[in-house]
Regions:
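Catalytic cores of the polymerase beta-like nucleotidyltransferase superfamily
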Residues: 1-172
């Protein structure tokens, strides 16, 4: 019998709950359950009780990570790595607009502390299928910003005994 894993995030907020949810990064993190509905956690009516102004439940059902607003990566550039880590952990995909915004915001990664980059990057590396997520980081123009030493390996051919170029060989 599989039990449902829940994360309860208690957080103080100012303004309305809707304003607080609007400050979140991704739709799947921008949902709330009123404390008065606590007992609904184990109820079939749970989804009717959830405050979900950004359609996070739909995105959970579709296994999709979508930004709440187009400024989330400018507001906190560490989210550039968090979105990939979250996708890896949940086995979700990023929606095309989120992907476009992440790629466009990649230069902002230089504003993130080394500790935060290290923590998110190591989290990504610890996931099953990490190679695929390294390719996602590369597609988003983030991987060589984290490890600039990898950039010269792109397109470098190897002797015929090798199937991949140096870059792809490094990822495998």
């Amino acid at each position: 019998e599989k039990t449902q894993d829940w994360t309860i995030d208690l957080w103080g907020y100012s303004g309305t709950i809707e304003e607080d949810l609007a400050r979140r990064d991704f739709t799947i993190d921008a949902m709330a359950l009123p404390l008065s509905e606590w007992e609904a956690l184990d109820s079939p009516e749970l989804f009717e009780k959830v405050l979900d102004p950004f359609n996070g439940l739909r995105d959970v059902a579709q296994k999709c990570i979508r930004v709440v607003n187009p400024h989330v990566f400018q507001d906190d550039p560490a989210r550039l790595l968090r979105v990939v880590h979250l996708a890896a952990r949940l086995h979700f995909r990023m929606d095309p607009e989120t992907t476009r915004l992440a790629f466009q915001s990649a230069p902002l990664l230089s504003q993130v502390s080394g500790d935060r980059i290290r923590n998110e990057f190591l989290g990504i590396l610890s996931m099953d299928g990490a190679r695929g997520y390294l390719q996602v980081l590369d597609h988003l123009d983030l991987l060589c910003r984290i490890i600039p030493e990898l950039a010269p390996a792109k397109g470098v051919e190897q002797p015929k005994e090798h199937y991949w170029d140096v870059w792809d060989h490094s990822l495998h």
